[in-house]
């Protein structure tokens, strides 16, 4: 197990999913004093068919009962709305594509939840993330999870050293099928529950319908790089770079992909073919930097992920100033998207990263 410490009192974030359920069961089995917390972080339209918060809370309570631990239900809805959801809407309004799970981890799971747990006398918090942690010479290192298909270090890159010191990831050395098998062995009601793919804490729902409740939309043209109109979009915020599905462009030839957004003209630029040169970039600029180690990485050669589950891309790190980094890739990268996170690695060590602001292609045009 990935504790790298000897905590006596651990509070587990129980989400109602299989991963956190097995996390709690493993810690209890290994003799730790364990309690659970279910975080209720979304209250808007919680009575509709898409939001699973109520069912998730029932599942978390059932898991706690089977494992034999106490569980508290704690409401962080106001903090979520202020720290995560407001940013989410702001980024979509600006034409970018945010990743709320990254901010949710930094602001809610490893800040609000951590503060609550410490206030309750806990030494450590545990979550069901597929990531590992090692302590070397007193320094806590965030490492990739052993299961390459499930590694979630990408979503944890904004954790600070003090947060890592108080966190453990018991599933980091396991693969998903093993976690499912353990859940069945522990007779957990979540053993066969499907993984969530919705927005962090909000659940799975039709995205366009959801976003329209909070932001105004305006239809506009889909155009080629030459300026030819080939279709109509239903609002720039509903599209992301590299998107293929849902464009509704007829005719023959290769599939169409989103290549850029022009906010001044309210136009969506589309190109034909996955390998169109406008979909590839050699460099990016990122800011809003956050690093997992006490010292930020030096300029040099690393690998990077610009989206979850992509293969590591070798790159050169250059500081433009204290708050801004340029990454130059060894090979062109496909559909690098402003608003997403670029996360740096040194081997298996997650060093941190930042928010992509621009690339060497004009993909978000604002003037």
From Swiss-Prot:
GO cellular component: cytoplasm
Region named Interaction with tRNA: 150-152, 307-308
Keyword Disulfide bond in annotation: yes
Classification via Gene3D superfamilies: Adenine nucleotide alpha hydrolases-like domains, HUPs, Translation factors
Coiled-coil ranges per UniProt: none
Alphabetical UniProt keywords: ATP-binding, Cytoplasm, Disulfide bond, Nucleotide-binding, RNA-binding, Transferase, tRNA processing, tRNA-binding
Domain of life: Bacteria
Binding site for ATP: 13-20, 39, 128
Reaction it catalyzes: S-sulfanyl-L-cysteinyl-[protein] + uridine(34) in tRNA + AH2 + ATP = 2-thiouridine(34) in tRNA + L-cysteinyl-[protein] + A + AMP + diphosphate + H(+)
Keyword ATP-binding among UniProt keywords: yes
GO molecular function, a single term: tRNA binding
Any one biological process term the GO annotation gives: tRNA wobble position uridine thiolation
UniProt enzyme class: transferase
The protein, known as: tRNA-specific 2-thiouridylase MnmA
The species this protein was found in: Neisseria meningitidis serogroup A / serotype 4A (strain DSM 15465 / Z2491)
Gene behind this protein: mnmA
């Amino acid at each position: 197990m990935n504790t790298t410490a000897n905590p006596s009192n651990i509070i587990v974030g129980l989400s109602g999913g299989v991963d956190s359920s097995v996390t709690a069961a493993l810690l209890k089995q290994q003799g730790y004093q364990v309690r659970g917390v279910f975080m209720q972080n979304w209250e808007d339209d919680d009575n509709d068919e898409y939001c699973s918060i109520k069912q998730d809370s029932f599942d978390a309570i059932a898991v706690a009962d089977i494992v034999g631990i106490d569980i508290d239900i704690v409401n962080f809805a106001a903090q979520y709305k202020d720290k995560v959801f407001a940013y989410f809407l702001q980024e979509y309004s600006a034409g970018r594509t945010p990743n709320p799970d990254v901010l949710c981890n930094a602001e809610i799971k490893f800040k609000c939840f951590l503060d609550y747990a410490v206030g309750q006398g806990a030494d450590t918090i545990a979550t069901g993330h597929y990531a590992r942690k090692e302590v070397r010479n007193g320094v806590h290192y965030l490492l990739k999870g052993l299961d390459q298909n499930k590694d979630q270090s990408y979503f944890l890159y904004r954790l600070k050293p003090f947060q890592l010191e108080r966190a453990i990831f018991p599933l980091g050395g396991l693969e998903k099928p093993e976690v499912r098998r353990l859940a069945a062995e522990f007779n957990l009601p979540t053993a066969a529950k499907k993984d969530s793919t919705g927005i962090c804490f909000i659940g799975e729902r039709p995205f366009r319908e959801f976003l329209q409740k909070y932001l105004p939309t305006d239809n506009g043209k889909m155009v080629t790089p030459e300026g030819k109109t080939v279709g109509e979009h239903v609002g720039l915020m509903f599209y992301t770079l590299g998107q293929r599905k849902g464009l509704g462009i007829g005719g023959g030839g290769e599939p169409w992909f989103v290549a850029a957004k022009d906010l001044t003209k309210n136009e969506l630029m589309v190109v034909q073919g996955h390998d169109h040169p406008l979909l590839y970039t050699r460099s990016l600029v990122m800011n809003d930097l956050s690093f997992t180690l006490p010292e930020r990485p030096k300029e040099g050669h690393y690998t990077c992920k610009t989206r979850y589950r992509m293969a590591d891309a070798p790159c050169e790190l250059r500081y433009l100033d204290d708050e801004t980094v340029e990454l130059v890739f060894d090979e062109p990268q496909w559909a690098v998207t402003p608003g997403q996170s670029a996360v740096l690695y040194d081997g298996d060590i997650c060093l941190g990263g930042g928010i992509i602001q621009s690339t060497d292609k004009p993909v978000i045009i604002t003037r």
